[in-house]
Amino acid sequence: MELRLYDTLSREKRTFTPLDPSNVRMYVCGPTVYDFAHIGNARPVIVFDVLFRLLRHVYGEAHVKYVRNITDVDDKINDRAARDFPGLPLNEAIRKVTEQTEKQFHDDVDALGCLRPTVEPRATEHIGEMRDIIDRLIAGGFAYVAADHVLFSPQAMNAKDGVLPRYGALANRSLDEMIAGARVDVAPYKRDATDFVLWKPSKPGEPSWPSPGGIAVQGRPGWHIECSAMSWKHLGERFDIHGGGIDLVFPHHENEVAQSCCAFHTERMAETWMHNGFLQVEGEKMSKSLGNFVTIRELLATDKFGGKRWDGAVLRLAMLKTHYRSPIDWTVEALHEAEKAIYDWSEFTKDATPAPCDEVIDALADDLNTPKMIAELHGLRRVGKPAELLGALQLLGIGRVFRQTIEIDVNAQALIEARTAARARKDFKESDRIRDELAAMGVVLKDGKDADGKPVTTWEIAR
């Protein structure tokens, strides 16, 4: 079997040959933990989980390392912490926000059937690596200190001879195009409009660390340097796959390439760059102003979208019906179609023992061709191969959902509402009794909070 993946940098589908087949390495940009993950955030999580599963199948579980970071230092986090916990010192409020949001993220992606990455590094745990890279860039003439900031110079990078790539190659943009697209209000301490921040001074009360480059005041990292540092720490100077959403190609991934290649004097940071396409909702861009902004948690736990809650397996299958590089239209109709298929497959495979299915593997090996993969799943159902269908579903992380869960859904939701009311009036004895009743129905509860901080309870059928 030949695995072929589309590389954003070369703009072609290429045979995937790992640098070391005994240690296949993949990095994917993870969440900034300040708010609930929305359904658009779920797309790269699901897409690269499927790739992770495929790589483990091909090379062995022990030989694949998947790193997905947690960004826990960011202006959005600071703003959310100050808003939600105005009575606490900012650093303590930030800790509460990041810990709570990270847990919410994990609960959501677990419900989507995603495996945990091999490593999930937090940015704040890698400040030393960030300073190290920045000092290398200053020493190499690629970065400079100005007004207590450290800035990277794409002009300096492109002026160097040798193995370094051209800045703008990943996004397929020239420096002139970038300058033309830069904002008019360029910071006065920048030498050039395309220069970007590696390190900046912290405001009073904000998270801060000793600065690189001999800067006397404490500061904090820019966004782009964080991923260069974490990928270097856990995967090395050069690794196999770097993934994320198409919106990250520029400037985030372009700047990662610049930082890492200049710091380590290499022509490539990752051998293959993969990016998933945008998501829209019912034919429109998702936005709060249009009222179509929906989080993973809302899809799982409320009737906001389509008048019902959706099982994580349904969301996962609906996401995979569109090829990862194409835009996806997230619709209620698509969810109903996915739900119908999963109900049918679940009944068909309920007495089966899983068996391998080469046709599904071959579809995935062709640049994660999930539409073809789903056609193969329907084909297995049509020709009566429950063992192969079950094996394929397990490989893909698509859990089985049975029709009787519809009845459980109605009863469980009523009991959950009664339990929520009991908890609100601090009747914990009644709350525990209802929890036990649900457990007897085979329902496992998970308590959390919604995007507004209100208590919300999700549930799943015990496996």
Curated annotation (Swiss-Prot):
Gene3D superfamilies: HUPs
Swiss-Prot/TrEMBL cofactor(s): Zn(2+)
Keyword Aminoacyl-tRNA synthetase tagged: yes
Protein's cellular compartments: Cytoplasm
Pfam family, one: CysS_C
Extent of motif 'KMSKS' region: 285-289
EC number(s) per entry: 6.1.1.16
Positions in coiled-coil regions: none
InterPro entries cross-referenced by the UniProt entry: Cys-tRNA-ligase (IPR015803), Cys-tRNA/MSH_ligase (IPR024909), CysS_C (IPR056411), Rossmann-like_a/b/a_fold (IPR014729), tRNA-synt_1_cat_dom (IPR032678), tRNAsynth_Ia_anticodon-bd (IPR009080)
GO CC annotations, alphabetized: cytosol
Keyword Transferase in record: no
Main localization category: cytoplasm
Catalytic reaction annotation: tRNA(Cys) + L-cysteine + ATP = L-cysteinyl-tRNA(Cys) + AMP + diphosphate
Positions that bind Zn(2+): 29, 227, 252, 256
Keywords in alphabetical order: Aminoacyl-tRNA synthetase, ATP-binding, Cytoplasm, Ligase, Metal-binding, Nucleotide-binding, Protein biosynthesis, Zinc
BP-aspect Gene Ontology terms: cysteinyl-tRNA aminoacylation
EC main group: ligase
Alphabetical list of CDD domains matching this protein: CysRS_core (cd00672)
CC cofactor note: Binds 1 zinc ion per subunit.
Motif ('HIGH' region): 31-41
UniProt family annotation: Belongs to the class-I aminoacyl-tRNA synthetase family.
Quaternary context: Monomer.
The protein's name: Cysteine--tRNA ligase
Organism: Rhodopseudomonas palustris (strain BisA53)
